[in-house]
């Protein structure tokens, strides 16, 4: 499947025959800004990119932005863990896009996990 985390998605997920394997979530938390991390592929074939902007018309054609690959394997795994895995596992501040375009509170299972809280804890431990 495909997991997307963002606040302005121009996609309808879970549409039969089109996007049934796509899930879109939005995290409404302490921080307004979100990471611009793009991953393509799986496991050892995964390519990780960082960007200064989201991929919208206004950013791609009217501004100077940068998007670059993370070539260091260790760093790419860390970015994937902190940005993608962490945010897709958020089950307290996540909202999920429905096929009709509306959002509903995501009801995750297991121990409560807040992506932004976990990230702050991890980064302050290493400060």
Question: Predicted regions span which residues?
Answer:
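Single conserved hydrophobic/aromatic residue that forms the stacking wall/gate
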Residues: 1-6, 10-11
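Extended hydrophobic/aromatic segments used for targeting, binding, or gating
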Residues: 12-29, 52
């Amino acid at each position: 499947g495909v997991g997307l985390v963002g606040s302005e998605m121009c996609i309808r997920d879970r549409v039969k025959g089109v996007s049934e394997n796509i899930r879109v979530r939005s995290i409404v938390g302490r921080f307004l800004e979100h990471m611009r991390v793009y991953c393509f592929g799986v496991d050892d074939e995964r390519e990780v990119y960082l960007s200064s902007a989201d991929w919208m018309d206004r950013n791609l054609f009217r501004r100077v932005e940068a998007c670059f690959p993370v070539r260091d394997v260790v760093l790419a795994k860390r970015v994937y863990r902190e940005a993608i895995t962490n945010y897709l596992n958020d089950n307290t501040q996540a909202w999920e896009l429905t096929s009709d375009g509306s959002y509903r509170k995501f009801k995750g299972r297991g121990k409560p996990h807040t992506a932004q809280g976990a990230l702050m804890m991890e980064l302050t431990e290493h400060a």
